[in-house]
A protein has these predicted regions:
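Conserved RNase H-like, two-metal-ion catalytic cores of nucleic-acid enzymes
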Residues: 1-118
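A short, charged helix-loop
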Residues: 118-142
């Protein structure tokens, strides 16, 4: 679901507080810029997934901060370093109670750069399309 207003984001946060777990991914642009420019945030709880478009639909970033930094909610990332970098640049802090599935794969014999697509194939037998992996996330409409 594309989040169009703060009310929708508040409802999602309330559901996430009950679930106590979310998955987070960001899309950004970092060509010819020192700091990455946030273009999209994707968050899923146990019942729904949302897309936050900070370019076309300005949302109260305080609400995003509340979700991402709620220590009672476990955050799941894959290859979190760049997500953490952009979140730190926005909010000046690193999320707590977070897990990086890429790091979790390392004790199982995977290297430190195992892709999300590889993990999905190996563990879930699901092939993930990577056709949009290198698109310019600044371009609208999505």
């Amino acid at each position: 679901m594309l989040i169009l207003n703060n009310g929708q984001l508040k409802q999602f946060y309330q559901k996430s507080q009950k679930d106590k777990i979310i998955a987070v991914d960001t899309e950004f642009h970092r060509i010819n810029t020192y700091f990455p420019k946030l273009c999209l945030i994707q968050i899923s709880n146990l019942s729904e997934s949302i897309i936050i478009d900070p370019i076309d639909f300005p949302i109260d970033f305080k609400l995003i901060e509340e979700i991402i930094y709620d220590e009672k909610i476990k955050k799941i990332f894959h290859s979190a370093s760049q997500d953490i970098e952009i979140l730190f640049n926005l909010f000046g802090k690193v999320p707590k109670n977070m897990h990086d599935t890429q790091i979790c794969l390392m004790p199982l014999g995977y290297d430190n750069s195992t892709s999300y697509a590889k993990a999905c194939v190996d563990f879930l037998k699901i092939e993930i399309s990577k056709e949009n992996q290198f698109i310019d996330w600044r371009v609208r409409p999505l």
